[in-house]
């Protein structure tokens, strides 16, 4: 009698649970995965190569488009690498603004993750709830930079501009009556900081809501507990970082272990898992949202009390003010040179890493003294995590592969770069 062979199945790239353009070639024995082979490159846009043809400042918007749900954190790694090479110190107010927006971005990312992960597993409501909160945070992005997603707000030497004193309000339209309008604009009467403060006062209750729906939910636990278990040793050897590593019980967070900006002045905790399964990683990320809330609250408090510059006053790197430019010839020349030729960065190399919502996001930058990078290497956390999929999915069912892709929080912009 002929023996039954394993059969091969293509998962994606046109698949709702494939998180973009993931293509998996699965080798199955019945419904059990024997091997999972990720095929990447379907969203490759040559970001690293493009950076070699652009001035240092022109590449900032490209960073937004790497992991397109954690926009500002990508920029942060890039501008930190440039600042290391230039040897410049960023004003403290700008550092607090950066840290605040890093944490807002972390919450944005985790809201997207919890919504998509739950939807993949079969829970619909959390997805809608998460997007309700994301909307407010997108408005914060828009208030400060003019764009809801691709902000290009961080610049070498600081941030693009200080926080606005007023929050944009909803306007009257045919579909909104006066009562609805006044309710929508209720928390938008003050400054941007007031709005952020109001949001993060409400937000812990929202996180409790998600936990009510998921944490003790029988079906959720059946789908996540004991799935994709990674031991602490394997997690380290596989190059995992971020929530994936902490879910396996290793307390490693760049914000604590290699503090950058003002993280060493802030009070927060690092959540750590025990079993290293999908459920633990879920709990770690939910707790991270609570810790981000603490950090943002501290930043808001500090920013209210301490006005000051948000950009260095070295006009070789940072553009001069509009007012100065109209009255001073030198400043006009600086402005012209900056936006045509860009600034020249001293010869050398630098590596800057930030604690990205998905793990360690690193930028390795080599300069040959020109106005463009000689080479830019992006260390994307999702790339290392996706390569562990084969090991994590082996011996599980097809349905569990969806859970494992969800727990890895894969975004293809950064995997393919």
UniProtKB/Swiss-Prot annotation:
Its main location: membrane. It is a peripheral membrane protein. Keywords: Cell inner membrane, Cell membrane, Membrane, NAD, Quinone, Translocase, Transport, Ubiquinone. It is found in: Cell inner membrane. InterPro entries: NADH_Q_OxRdtase_suD, NADH_UbQ_OxRdtase_49kDa_CS, NDH1_su_D/H, NiFe-Hase_large. Its EC number is 7.1.1.-. Transmembrane segments: none annotated. It comes from the Bacteria. GO terms for molecular function: NAD binding; NADH:ubiquinone reductase (non-electrogenic) activity; quinone binding. GO terms for cellular component: plasma membrane. It is an enzyme of class 7 (translocase). It catalyses: a quinone + NADH + 5 H(+)(in) = a quinol + NAD(+) + 4 H(+)(out). PROSITE patterns: COMPLEX1_49K (PS00535). Pfam families: Complex1_49kDa. NDH-1 shuttles electrons from NADH, via FMN and iron-sulfur (Fe-S) centers, to quinones in the respiratory chain. The immediate electron acceptor for the enzyme in this species is believed to be ubiquinone. Couples the redox reaction to proton translocation (for every two electrons transferred, four hydrogen ions are translocated across the cytoplasmic membrane), and thus conserves the redox energy in a proton gradient. Belongs to the complex I 49 kDa subunit family. NDH-1 is composed of 14 different subunits. Subunits NuoB, C, D, E, F, and G constitute the peripheral sector of the complex. This is NADH-quinone oxidoreductase subunit D. The gene is nuoD.
